[in-house]
Amino acid sequence: MFAPSYDAVLSYTSIGGVQCPRLCYKLVLVTVGLCFCIFCTSLDNTIVATAVPRITQQFHSLDDVGWYASAYLLTTCAVTLPFGRLYTFFPIKWVYLSALFVFELGSFICGITPSSLGLILGRAVAGLGGGGLFSGSLLIITQCVPLRRRPAFSGFIMSIFAVASVIAPLMGGAFTDHISWRWCFYINLPFGLVSAVVIFFTFQTTKPVVQASLREKAAGLDPLGTATFLPAIVCLLLATQWGGAQYPWGDGRIIALFTLFGVLLACFVGLQLWARERATLPPRLLRGRNIWGSALYGFCLNGAMFTFVYYLPIWFQAVQGTSATESGIRNLPLVISNVIFAIISGVLVSATGYFGPFMLLSAAMASIAAGLLSMLHPSSGAGEWIGYQVLLGSSIGMGFQLPVFVVQTTLASTDIPTATALMTFIQLLGGAIFVSVAQNVFRNQLAADIRAALPMLDPKAVINAGPTSLRAMYSGETLTTLVAMYNDAVVHTFYLAIGLAAASFLAATVIQWRPSPKSISHPDSS
């Protein structure tokens, strides 16, 4: 490892025990390395969607389809919050690189596996590593960037998450059609290698955020809380993934999963109240209205975002007859506006020190955009779906990263790792839960419409055929009717997004309108 001196050309600041230049090539390299890492971990959220038909054909594993996506999601959500404690008691650099190694190992297993079971296990392993990388990337920024500049850097990095989530199905389809579905996972290896090399050589940290003995660290990792939290989240996500899709909501398995979730969650809450400062989530963190308001805001806004990420491509493919690749291209207005406004939002928050007004504006714009998108119909022109997506992307880009900004500017440095992991977890959980809810809304509405207007068709067969097969299987008046039904079903998922965006607006009203005291009291970081 090398540590060149910047004294001759730059002034630098010490943040968290790390000597970091205000703006230099090493900071640029660290940011690029983090972007590579966030990009590949975010791809894994949705890239497998367009590869599933080819995978099931090769492995003859139609019954395993649900696990290809949920295995990664389950482990990612389950370990995100515990990673906050690891980042608190151990050097950020080594925890981050360890998580990256586990993620890369899982991706490698997915790429070389000869069986469906191997793919599921590989996805689960990748999720174990991925759960620590998003919050870890944001923590590295807090270590390297003066407070007033953090929102701009963090905003850019977090915009990569949204971009990757949107374009992942497009990349997955391209790899599957032109190379091999295995490249959906191999692509992570070079990205991860670049990120690991950059972080290893350019990011230097000396001490953990909290100094403690080995015994104190073991207690601070909250093994009892973790032992109840992990299975609780797994039960919740399995119930929302399976309910209404693989099993009826009244099925004994779904009821049992929700019951277990409730019992385990109650145990976790009790353990957190008992452990206090040694808890995975110290109760005092949730007493401030900025913290719980930001958590609710992120939960709802992310749920709305992922509803559109999943169902706008379905609208393009089923209603407007585009291919999977073309639908990805038509999502570019959402992607581009998201990136631009994430950067603009970060710069404005950095300049003013305020985040409350931007959270309100973001939620208001998202509510309007969701309402406009719910007005789409089979004859909607390009001007409508482009303009509505630009408004949606602008609103999401403006607000997506703000919950993290809140905790990083209002809490003590010792609480930032845990609070950052909390916000990351809440946002991931919101996306996971409401995509499942939207799936049930979509399937139930489409099935009801088919039974009412086309009783000669099997709703399950139509749904399982997928949007891209619609025009190959049906024609004439039947096709016209099915297209209208698909439009109606997708629009109903957008109604869900309207409610979520409105809820995020209510949550934003809780946030205090005052500049961060720390941002004002650090004139050297302006």
Curated annotation (Swiss-Prot):
**Membrane topology listed for this record:** Multi-pass membrane protein
Does Glycoprotein appear among the keywords? no
Q: What is its main location?
A: membrane
- Please tell me one Gene Ontology term that the record gives under cellular component: plasma membrane
Keywords carried by this UniProt record? Cell membrane, Membrane, Transmembrane, Transmembrane helix, Transport
Specify one Pfam family: MFS_1
Give the superkingdom in one word.
Answer: Eukaryota
Membrane-crossing ranges are: 23-43, 64-84, 89-109, 125-145, 155-175, 183-203, 218-238, 254-274, 296-316, 339-359, 360-380, 386-406, 418-438, 491-511
Question: Where does the record say this protein resides?
Answer: Cell membrane
Q: Which molecular-function annotations from GO does this UniProt entry contain?
A: transmembrane transporter activity
Q: What is the protein's known function? A: Efflux pump; part of the gene cluster that mediates the biosynthesis of aurasperone B, a dimeric gamma-naphthopyrone.
Recorded family membership: Belongs to the major facilitator superfamily. TCR/Tet family.
What is the protein name stated in its UniProt record?
A: Efflux pump aunC
Q: Which organism is this protein's natural source? A: Aspergillus niger (strain ATCC 1015 / CBS 113.46 / FGSC A1144 / LSHB Ac4 / NCTC 3858a / NRRL 328 / USDA 3528.7)
| Primary gene name | aunc
